[in-house]
Amino acid sequence: MAHPIQWKVIAMYDSNLDNIWHVEIKFVEDDTHTHATVRAQLRDGQAMTTHGDAYRNPNDSSQPMVGEEIAAARALIALGTELLQAASARIEQVTHRPVHLQG
C-alpha cells in the first residue's frame, strides 16, 4: 500500500540572506517502488517540479531509506538541470548569444 511521506529539506539563501527558496520533497512508496516529487518555490514566485524514481529488486531486502535517497537524488538532479536551463535562457535573453551551462 502506498503511503505519502513529506520531508522538508532545504532553505537556500542568497549572499544577502534576504531571499529564501523552499525545496520540498514528497515520497510515495510501495513494496518495490519509491517515487519522489521535488517542488522548489523560487524567490520570484516561480515554482519548479521534478520527479525521481527508485525500484527495488523483489529479491533484495526492504530498505525504504535507500529507495528514498535514490529517488530524491534523481529528482534533485532533474531540478538542478532545470535550474541550469532556466539560467541559460535568462543569460541568452541579455547577451543574445547561445549559452551552455554544465552541472
For each feature predicted by the language model, list its residue ranges.
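Short, well-ordered alpha-helical segments
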Residues: 65-81
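Flexible, active-site-adjacent loop/turn segments at secondary-structure boundaries
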Residues: 61-64, 68, 89
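Generic helix-packing signal
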Residues: 54-56, 75, 79, 91
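Short, structured coil/loop segments at alpha-helix boundaries
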Residues: 1-2, 40-45, 76-79
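Short, intrinsically disordered/low-complexity patches at protein termini
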Residues: 59-60, 72-74, 86, 95-97
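C-terminal binding/interaction regions
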Residues: 2-35, 84-103
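A short, structured beta-strand/loop element
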Residues: 33-64
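Generic preference for well-ordered secondary structure
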Residues: 22, 55-56, 67, 99
